[in-house]
Amino acid sequence: MPTYYLALHGGQSYNLIVDTDMSGNPSLSVIPTNPYQEQLSNNPLIQLQIVVGENTGAPAPPQPPPPPPPPPPPERRDAWTQEPLPLDMNPLGSDASQGPLASSIRMLCMAQYLLRNARGQQGLLRPLGPQTRSQVTLERQPVHNPRQEAPIILLQSPAPPRFTPVPMVALGHTLQPTPPPRPTLPQPRIPLIIPPRHTNQPATTPPTAPQRLTLGHQLSLPPHPPPHQSTPHCSSDSTGLPPPPTSYSIPSMTLSPEPLPPPAAPAHPLPGVIYDQQALPPTPGPPWWPPVRDPTPTTQTPPTNTKQGPDQGQGRGRWRGRGRSKGRGRMHKLPEPRRPGPDTSSPSMPQLSPVVSLHQGQGPENSPTPGPSTAGPVCRVTPSATPDISPIHEPESSDSEEPPFLFPSDWYPPTLEPAELDESWEGIFETTESHSSDEENVGGPSKRPRTSTQ
């Protein structure tokens, strides 16, 4: 069915005409009843969607399928632990036994039970409120006994005048109805105390048979206490009654020591990472520069490497070369880059001296025959016609090896030396043995080509 989209002014009246054109398709024409008002209207445009076709209830059937999604929630076994959906019209449910309402009540009860256990209250909830309050106070009384150790020690002290000012009341269970208004004052923390028996047994009276002493509150006692209150402690006259409020600071000290405040934090923090970093010297250069070690350890390391240099050079030459001449060429060539280094150790010099004497002996002579026997195999392995390039440029590279380094020599780790790095990159483009054999002729570059042509 064709669909038309129109934009018309709100509050206007239009004539909608549906017709069929020449090709049989429906044609729509919307004509305003007042064309002049249409042009001058300030009302906003309203988008309309007009579907031309038979008047059938086709869009109604797709709406019933959305109701089937509600059945899946009953299938979930963990529905009691889930929050209700925001689109649910009846979040509490209608079922009294397994609905969300019953499960939410269970969740609330369980949360309250966990909260009470976390606070130290064990057991199930008591059904009546006033009973729980009285029982909780009775349970707390034995817990506070360790706080009252100091008053018991004071009862054992022999000094009699200290006890008369302290307003301590000894009441039996028979005399408890006499002070009903006293526990209403705001100091319910003082529980029952059982003093030692040997001090109070000779002076006991009939009302104090249960041997339980209840400490009175400091503000609840009258200025003149009854005679039965002072008799269990000590026999004293009524003249010591005025000083009680002045010397009553002792019980307040007994309650303070247990809830001590936490220790104060140290004024200066312990030495940590920041303190260790202050001890380290600042690294030279920008922060991205690699760490530069002190020059003292690096000056000691090169001689050990220079001793190992020729041996490593021989090993690499033998791996790469195909004959003895190539291995010897590596051995002669490798110590040369180490000459401009900072430290030329004495053990490496005896290895360098025969090489220099070999080239010096061949320099003044025009024929290679009077030279030492070590040069014999070298002459046999020079068949190429392009040996002039390497002997001319090799000594220049060996003499000017210090400037082209990207990093200072101290930065390289002890296992890698600048000379070893250059040696490892030299043999990349070697395709023939002539290049390595000509490296030996650094001392006399102009003599070897003539021998090959002769």
Swiss-Prot record:
Alphabetic keyword roster: Activator, Host nucleus, Host-virus interaction, Inhibition of host innate immune response by virus, Inhibition of host interferon signaling pathway by virus, Interferon antiviral system evasion, Modulation of host cell cycle by virus, Modulation of host PP1 activity by virus, Phosphoprotein, Transcription, Transcription regulation, Viral immunoevasion
* Skewed-composition ranges (Low complexity): 190-203, 295-306
- Tell me, in one coarse class, where this protein mainly resides: host cell
Q: Where is the composition biased (Polar residues)?
A: 359-368
What the entry says about post-translational processing? Phosphorylated.
- Compartment(s): Host nucleus matrix
Q: Where is this motif: PXLXP motif, interaction with host ZMYND11?
A: 350-354, 404-408
| Key word Transcription present | yes
Q: Would you name any one GO CC term? A: host cell nuclear matrix
The biased composition feature labelled Pro residues covers 59-73, 177-189, 258-269, 281-294
Would you say which domain of life the source belongs to?
Viruses
Q: Where is the composition biased (Basic residues)?
A: 317-332
Chain positions covered by the region annotation Disordered = 55-98, 175-454
Q: Provide a Gene Ontology MF annotation, just one.
A: protein serine/threonine phosphatase inhibitor activity
Provide a GO biological process annotation: symbiont-mediated suppression of host innate immune response
Subunit architecture = Interacts with human SMARCB1/INI1, presumably generating an open chromatin conformation at the EBNA2-responsive target genes. Interacts with human WAPL. Interacts with host CBF1; this interaction allows transcriptional activation by EBNA2. Interacts with host general transcription factors GTF2B, ERCC2 and ERCC3. Interacts (via PXLXP motif) with host ZMYND11/BS69 (via MYND-type zinc finger). Interacts with host EBF1.
Summary of the function given for this chain in its UniProt record: Plays a key role in the activation of the host resting B-cell and stimulation of B-cell proliferation. Acts by up-regulating the expression of viral EBNA1-6, LMP1, LMP2A and LMP2B genes, as well as several host genes including CD21, CD23 and MYC. Activates transcription by acting as an adapter molecule that binds to cellular sequence-specific DNA-binding proteins such as host CBF1, SMARCB1 and SPI1.
UniProt record similarity statement: Belongs to the herpesviridae EBNA2 family.
Record's protein name:
Epstein-Barr nuclear antigen 2
